[in-house]
Amino acid sequence: SACAEIGYRSAGTLEFLYQDGEFYFIEMNTRIQVEHPVTELITGIDLVKAQLRLADGERLPWTQDDVQIRGHAIECRINAEDPKTFTPSPGPVKLWHAPGGPGIRVDSHLYTGYNVPPYYDSLVAKVIAHGEDRDTAIARMRNALNEIVVEGIKTNTPLHQEIFQHAAFRAGGTDIHYLERRLGLKEPDAEPQRRAMTAGGRSGTFPRA
């Protein structure tokens, strides 16, 4: 209804903050977010294809009432950076092995022999795990993180592994300051630290796309 009110016709993302059982609207981004695979896995809808069809003047073959939420999905952003200091780690990739298995999706441009440049964002891969519930998604993600092999550069994969082993994260209910407290960081709002906390999950009770 917000998009219809302003006459917007394309893919977009409405962002909310969750506090004390309530959702608070922040903003709308007129683009698809990095986390869009989470939405695609729990709805079965290809958002990029839908956006291209809209741009070409086509109508969507479904309505909001047709969209059903199935299961839970979690995404980890794999960055080419030191997992402790968050400093960039560009350079040649001597070996790259992507994880696989049931419910695992990997979006990446990495390959063995690729040279990670120092000029752009450090994101080199997205690993997404989908399962019938949060516990299943977490278990699959933990296996996927253990399967990742990257040699030649540093990545934040060890940080993700540590987060998924932490009982507080597995139990849910962590907030935006979780990583700050966990690692004893002094600057909770610094951009590299914000990007590092990328294990964001969505289920039928979390409306953000």
Roles of regions detected by a PLM:
Residues S1-Y8, R59-W62:
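Conserved ATP-binding module of the ATP-grasp superfamily
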Residues A4, F16-Q19, Q64-D66, N115:
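N-terminal hydrophobic alpha-helix used for membrane targeting or insertion
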Residues Y8-Q33:
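Conserved metal-phosphate-binding beta-hairpin within the catalytic cores
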Residues Q33, P37-A209:
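Catalytic cores of soluble metabolic enzymes centered on carboxylation/carboxyl-transfer
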